[in-house]
């Protein structure tokens, strides 16, 4: 496995560990989620370039579209929650309260 793939997988694992460790704030969870999506985007782009298959180039673009939608929804939830409750702690939120 080339070193570039190992670096990208390491960045995904570090973002995943950050998501698991720093899950108390919604903002830090969103940042770790964006780091995971960025590493997945770079990995899928490199795979599409190495496959030499024209239809494989659609996958990174579709992943980027879903990542942008996820970021927009996440930031909208962050603004809504911080305006309603005044903080962004994840453990204070419940499905029954929202």
Swiss-Prot record:
It is a multi-pass membrane protein. One of its GO terms (molecular function) is NADH dehydrogenase (ubiquinone) activity. GO terms for biological process: ATP synthesis coupled electron transport. One of its GO terms (cellular component) is mitochondrial inner membrane. It catalyses: a ubiquinone + NADH + 5 H(+)(in) = a ubiquinol + NAD(+) + 4 H(+)(out). The chain crosses the membrane at residues 1-21, 29-49, 58-78. Its EC number is 7.1.1.2. It is found in: Mitochondrion inner membrane. InterPro entries: NADH_UbQ_OxRdtase_chain4L/K, NUOK/Mnh_C1-like. Its main location: mitochondrion. Keywords: Electron transport, Membrane, Mitochondrion, Mitochondrion inner membrane, NAD, Respiratory chain, Translocase, Transmembrane, Transmembrane helix, Transport, Ubiquinone. It comes from the Eukaryota. Core subunit of respiratory chain NADH dehydrogenase (Complex I) which is composed of 45 different subunits. Belongs to the complex I subunit 4L family. Core subunit of the mitochondrial membrane respiratory chain NADH dehydrogenase (Complex I) which catalyzes electron transfer from NADH through the respiratory chain, using ubiquinone as an electron acceptor. Part of the enzyme membrane arm which is embedded in the lipid bilayer and involved in proton translocation. This is NADH-ubiquinone oxidoreductase chain 4L. The lineage of its organism: Eukaryota, Metazoa, Chordata, Craniata, Vertebrata. The gene is MT-ND4L.
């Amino acid at each position: 496995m080339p070193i570039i793939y190992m670096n990208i997988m390491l960045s995904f694992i570090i973002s995943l560990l950050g998501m698991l460790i720093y899950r108390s704030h919604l903002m830090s969870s969103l940042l770790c989620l964006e780091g995971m999506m960025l590493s997945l985007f770079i990995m899928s782009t490199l795979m599409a370039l190495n496959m030499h298959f024209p239809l494989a180039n659609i996958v990174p673009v579709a992943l980027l579209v879903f990542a942008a939608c996820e970021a927009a929804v996440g930031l909208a939830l962050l603004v809504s929650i911080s305006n309603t409750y005044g903080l962004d702690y994840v453990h204070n939120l419940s499905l029954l309260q929202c």
